[in-house]
């Protein structure tokens, strides 16, 4: 296998971790980026077990200088960047009329601006490699709700940002797409349900069963399923796909 390097942000847990492990099958090296080093080391062990080399970079991508650091360390370690997968970014789920300016800014700083800055900093290496970029949005971009307005708003911005990058990528030879997952049962979602369920008079397992019924889907998605979709997007089989937004949500969004 020729040398190939993927950079995955948010790789310490959930979809980010699953994606890093999945890409270890197709790339010789995977650079893992997130804030929690101990969790990143756990991911790194699984990436190595899958056959790829790793580089762990623990920093906060909401800091403006962080993107340059990631690119510099990735290039110093492996000499190239073929794929960038922007997954990092937990957005506060707070009601539209209660969320402060500071909370809005914090939500955008990591998921939107962190991904934007990192893609820009990695762009020259991606152009050289004729590489690919994936940005993580979410199906709340299609049906934003007042109780978690920032989630839908920022996810919509991510989808638009990916379209803008893909427009430039047509000229520069860089493939850019975004992914819109639906309700995936990650550790973060389970933690949320552990707080939400007792406040609504039900067990966590009751809440896990109830949500898919209300969303008219069969079940929650799994992080590994989203990782497989991302694996396809950055594979040679999808090379002619750019500027697309791929939704995987178990059929939750019923629109055409």
Language model: regions and residue ranges:
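Short, small/polar-rich loop/turn modules that mediate ligand/substrate recognition or access, typified
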Residues: 170, 175, 241-243
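Alpha-helical segment proximal to the catalytic Tyr-Lys
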Residues: 124, 167-168, 239
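Conserved glycine-rich Rossmann-like NAD(P)H-binding loop of the short-chain dehydrogenase/reductase
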Residues: 27-42
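Substrate-binding pocket helix/loop in short-chain dehydrogenase/reductase
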Residues: 95-96, 103-108, 211
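Catalytic loop of short-chain dehydrogenase/reductase
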Residues: 132-158, 162-171, 183-184
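Conserved glycine-rich cofactor-binding loop
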Residues: 5, 12-13
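Short C-terminal tail/terminal secondary-structure segment
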Residues: 14, 143, 231, 242-256
